[in-house]
Amino acid sequence: MHVLHTFANNDSVPYLTWFAERARREGDPRYTFLVMYPKRPRMIDEMRALGFSVEWIPYDDRQRKRGMLFALPRLWWYMRRYRPDVVHSNLFDDSLPGMIAAWLAGINVRVVTKQDTGFHWMHAPRWMRLDRLISRMATHVIAISDECERFLIERECADPKKVVRIHNGIPPAAFTQQDPSLMEQLRARFAIAGKGPIIGTVARFIEWKGYRYIIGAAARIVKQHPDARFLLCGTGGQENEIRNLVSQSGLDAHVIFTGWVDRKEMASFYGLLDIYLHAAILEPFGLVYAEAMMNGVPVVSTPTGAALDAIVDGKNGILVNERSAEALALGVERMLSADARGMGAAGKETALRMYHFNVMWEGTIDLYRRALDKQR
């Protein structure tokens, strides 16, 4: 079985690497990768080292329309050259030209994973018609959460018969190896020794991640817990705005902007936390939920993405209303007064069962095989 993946705007994609490593061990499928990126992507060397073909198509998302028009014939040419059994696209910028190119190239199994569901609906509604076109051009549409599946059917008007729910997944061993000595270094780096509760979030600084509500919640929480510390781990265009909001709220002593935390340090970072707090609005999935839960961190979250699918309120985590600092603060207070350790352990068991990479692998490979069987 030969699967050709397209991907845009990233020069290295962890879950594609995990798929490639697994395929190399098992001898199937054979992968080809077409990467749309401004400069030569790291994925070229990573995937070729694993024995798979990679082609680079120069693409700059700052010139989106022109870039996709430039990429379309090149995608088509590579698909005609490689003749894969399956074309699988992942993000809007590669899915729109990728699905069109695959259809023109006569590829009968065209799979799209909707990793960025809802973005255009919230921020650029006029692009929604192209999201719908992608779903029409695809033969199979992977929804990565229940909320994503409902959105695809109800708002993108995707054919329910095409939609298959396959959760994203991570290999636990790569994300749960906490190092006590590194944890001590991180405590010193963030100046949180002897403080608590330690409440953290991992997300880009963009509006729909809900940082403004986290800061509003922090202002309420510190009144009852003056030694509370909030670790905000991320980068993004809204960071300066959030920094100003922290200062205006008198929270400079309580909120720490962690800056870059290396991927290899993330398990130890989660080990610092008493609570993982997430305030996203329409999160397609959110791998950080799975990471935090697999590390046994009690989660307080808005009801979206992987959190909504996994958490039973009060059993293995706490769910609160979106766009509400008060609800987030009350959720944290509920967690602090509950058996947080037990809730974290229950969340870990749930995440290992639902969001293990093996589940994602098996669901995806099964989809390919069933789709190809129907073509025979």
Feature names for model-found ranges:
Residues 281:
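Aromatic "clamp/platform" in nucleotide-sugar-dependent glycosyltransferases that forms part
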